Amino acid sequence: MMSTLFSNSISTSTKRRRQPRFQAVETHMFDPSIKAVLCDIGGVLYVGDTPIPGAIETLDRIKSRYSVRFVTNTTQKTAQQVVEALRSMGFDIAEDEVLTALDVTKLFLKNHDSRGFYLLTDDATAFFDDLNEIERQHYVVVGDAQENFTYERLNKAFRLLQSGSELIAVAKNRYFKDNDYQLSMDAGGFVSALEYASGKEAHIIGKPSHDFYRLACSSMNVEPAECLMIGDDIESDILGAQEAGLKTLLVKTGKFVVQDLESGIMPDFIADSIADIP
């Protein structure tokens, strides 16, 4: 049975882009068109290794009313590893409810019968080991490589691109909220550097890719217009979802900064945290 996802504690706004001011009004809203929810993970459900206050209980309520998928641009963890981490914090989440950019990247490579040169962490690179028998190496795959972002490896990636390989960005986020609760640089800057040097545009696998959002919606047998995206990233979560046809709710936790409200990207709804959803 459908139930309202919104109450007076959540502000709504008309979807307007490139406006000089963010304007929101308080309202009580019942939206019967919403049949499913996509929910970002880091910054929305938890920060560091601590759940957002009220997130566990709120998530249980949402899951009792809607089909839910948890979508994340993490380039360091598989769906199984994400679920293990969330369960250790007290969240009740199944592996088939999680869609990660890393898992979709592996599916992409398999479908294109290719392995990659990986600018990833050692653990993330090991996730692709079963593709090593594929002779064709047609892609440079870039995610958050941390200490593996060396000049030597970046230059090798550049030379492969110059030799004909294509560039894949597992994700292209600017920054993320780190375990010390400060913003840290994400993979996007390194992807942009390789794009600039090689003259090639990266194919983005994760959010804000339309294909990623459509894959998540189709896994619940709903159309994008019937789905709400909850996130803390004004570009990947909000703008990306809007352009894919979803409704959006921005939470002021995680990587959210006040300047996001001046970006001209207008979420359909805004809340202080996921706990404000009744």
Which residue ranges define each predicted feature?
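Methionine residue identity
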Residues: 1-2
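Asp-based, Mg2+/Mn2+-dependent phosphohydrolase catalytic module
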Residues: 5-6, 15-39, 44-61, 76, ...
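Conserved phosphoryl-transfer catalytic core
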Residues: 66
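Conserved phosphate-coupling serine/threonine residues in phosphotransfer and NTP-handling enzymes
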Residues: 72
